[in-house]
Structures are given as C-alpha cells and as structure tokens.
Amino acid sequence: MKKTNITRNHLTFLAAAILCCLFAAGADAADGKLRIMVFGAHPDDCELKAGGVAAMWAKLGHKVKFVSTTNGDIGHAIMAGGQLAKRRTREVKAAAKILGIESHVMDNHDGELMPTLENRKALTRLIRDWKADIVMGHRPNDYHPDHRYTGVLMQDAAFMVTVSNFAPDTPQLNKNPVFLYLSDYFKKPNPFAPDLVVGIDDVVEQKAEALWTLQSQIESFWSARNFETVIPVPTDPAKRAAKKREFTQAFGRRTRGTADRFREKLIELYGEKKGRSIQHAEAFELCEYGRQPSPAELKKLFPFFGEN
C-alpha cells in the first residue's frame, strides 16, 4: 500500500510538471501580445517603411520581426558580394536592437529575387514559425523587381499559411494573419490607398537612430543618389554629427510628407485636433488576401489611436 501511494505521488507530480510545461509552451500565444512580421526586399526597406510603428509595438511588449528577402549584396557603389551582404546584415541587426525588435536576412542575391515555389515555401515557413498575427510587405506594383516579387510572394503566402499539406514540415496557422502593404507612390494599376496612417512623432528620433546604423546605404545611394559614387560618412566627430543632423532632417521630411499626404486619414483615425497636430507618419493598406478585419479589429491590431 505504501509503495502504491509513492507511485501515485510520483504520477501526480509528473502530471503537474507536464501541465506546467504545456502552459509555458503556450505562454507567447496566450499572453495577449501581437506578433508582427514585415517583409522588405532589401536590408533597409522594412526600417524605412515600418521602423516607427515597429518601435511603437515593441514599446507595448508586442513582438516584431523584420525580414529582408534578399541579402543586399549589390547595394553599394564599390563593395559587393558576401562582404557587403555580411555588412548589411550587421547593420539591420544593429537597427533592430535600437527598435527593440528582431531581424532576419534571407540569402537571396540582391536584384535576383524570383517568385519561385521554393521562396513561396520559405515565406510560408517564416510566417508560420513566427505565428504572425500581422504580416506586411511591398505592393506587387513597384519600381524594383525585388520589391514586386516580395509583394507577390507575400500574397501567395497569404493563403498557403493555412494549408496543412503545403510545406508540411511547419504546422499551418489555424487563424489567417491580417496582411497589409507598405506605402509607395506608384499610380498604376492603382494608387496606394491607406486604411491606416499611424502617427510616429514619439518614436521618430528612435527610427532615425536606427536608420543611421545603415551606414552602407548612407555613404552610397542615400547620399550620392546613384550606385557609382561613395560619399564616406565623416570620422571627425563634429563633421560626423553634422552629417547625422543632415541625415535625420532628410528622413524627417519623408515622414512629414507621409503625414501631410494622408492628413485626412489621420483626422479620421485620431480626431480633428490630434490628426492635425501629427507631424510624422507611416501608412499601410489592407491586402484583400488573408483575414479581413473589421475597423474595430484593425484598431486593436494597431493600438495607437485611442478614443476620438
């Protein structure tokens, strides 16, 4: 009898331990925190288009991962190949640390991304592994082929993430994420029409600080506006500080432009007073693939608007 009691005690302890493990394993899904994945074609696209909103989600404890679908290995006037790919990966990892998020760079050559079955499966696995509630990426009409095909691949994954026998090595998602597009200026076949415009005034300096880590782009395309010239970032402290101020002001003009461009939407979402006062913004358009949230659910997924 005594031996039986010990056995039962052991079984009770074991059952309790198993339950604890199960609850711990599901903690991320049950903690009420959102999981967001943003796809950009190059190691800077996510940071440029969604760095502000990512920092805001992160401050609220939500989990954000930026994914570059190419390694950026030709995005410089002089440097290229593996050396540049490694440099740009280091840069976006540093930017992610500033924003309070995670970063991943896929090993596809810059300028050579194709909407292949292999890449469709790769994006599907990434979304599933992250257990994403929200997925964002480029629209498929864009000036750069890598941007276009990133958009196509995201659209293709929008349904396949729920199909159990597609890429069956990762469990399908039982709830389809909400998919959204990052902003752009292209008009044909249809212009970007945001469903959400988020004021980022409180984090615009944090976003600029993250972008400042992308030195390979600052010294090349962002400064020279071509891929033939390098304008090195000064090493002299005073000149470097002046360059940083110039850089911060330039990107401030971009986010101010977004706020001004979509002022009426800001007023609709934030109310008249707040909507008119916002100086810096990022904008996102709902994709017609994936889960179609109500306006009320969208505001829960983007919990930045308050009551108006």
Across the structure, where does each feature detected by a protein language model lie?
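N-terminal secretory signal peptides that target proteins for export/translocation
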Residues: 1-8
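Bacterial N-terminal signal peptides
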Residues: 10-24
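Active-site rim/loop-helix segments in enzyme catalytic domains that contact anionic ligands
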Residues: 28-130, 136, 152, 160
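Short acidic, glycine/proline-rich loop/turn micro-motifs
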Residues: 76-79, 190-194
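Active-site adenylate/phosphate-handling loop in enzymes that bind or generate adenylated species
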Residues: 126-170
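Functional cores that coordinate and move charged inorganic groups
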Residues: 147, 152, 156, 179-181, ...
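Active-site cores that bind ATP or allylic diphosphates and position pyrophosphate for catalysis
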Residues: 163, 173-177, 181-182
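C-terminal accessory domains and tails appended to enzymatic cores
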Residues: 167-168, 173-175, 190, 196-308
